Regions:
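Short linear regulatory motifs enriched in tryptophan with gly/pro/ser
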Residues: 1-200
Length: 200
């Protein structure tokens, strides 16, 4: 089975927060978003989009919601398979949660022709998953400083907020078990998406 080894990293995270993983070929971009959220540790209840900059192409959850926005070509994530893009591009952006705007750079490291499992696997990682709905990467770092300072006026409120709903350590084994349980049915793309997107 063909698969792709990738590395996803949160933009502007210092030190970098990243995951290296393998994902089977033949998935739609909607399914890839589920994988990326699982790999990163996101809950997955926010909107998302994929951006391929030099193609001037956005792939989003619901195409009809974005008609007429911007000059980029728009494709619908559930109707577009990943393979033509994974085999011709070096990287792309994945944006999760348009409010907090978690921007990730996803590097396509290599194509694997003889991948055994039918499910994604995280190989390595660095950094814990940020708190969901905290306001983005910079607010996340502000929040960490508040949590370290018991004298800060927001310390108790922020401590209760994180402990009550959002605190979780990144457990590699647990993440991989969750990914293994994913039923990722492969999709067929519309012929146009494979044959015409790289016609020039």
């Amino acid at each position: 089975m063909k698969a792709y080894q990738m590395k996803i990293a949160i933009k502007n995270s210092h030190p970098p927060i990243w995951r290296r993983f393998i994902v089977p070929a033949g998935l739609s971009f909607s399914q890839l978003s589920i994988v990326l959220n699982g790999v990163m540790g996101w809950c997955g209840y926010h909107l998302f989009k994929f951006e391929f900059y030099h193609l001037r192409l956005n792939i989003k959850e619901k195409y009809e919601d974005f008609i007429g926005l911007g000059e980029e070509e728009q494709l619908e994530a559930s109707e577009t398979i990943i393979d033509p893009f994974m085999e011709q591009e070096d990287w792309f952006s994945y944006i999760y949660d348009f409010g907090d705007y978690w921007e990730h750079r996803v590097t396509i490291e290599k194509v694997i022709e003889d991948y055994g499992p039918s499910y994604p696997v995280v190989l390595k990682y660095k950094g814990e998953t940020p708190f969901e709905d905290c306001g983005g990467i910079y607010r996340y770092y502000d929040l960490q400083e508040i949590l370290k300072d018991p004298s800060h006026p927001e310390h108790e409120n922020m401590k209760a907020w994180t402990e009550g709903h959002f605190t979780r350590d990144y457990d590699l084994n647990e993440v991989n078990e969750s990914l293994k349980r994913m039923a990722l049915e492969k999709k067929k793309s519309k012929p146009m998406l494979q044959n015409e997107i790289y016609e020039e």
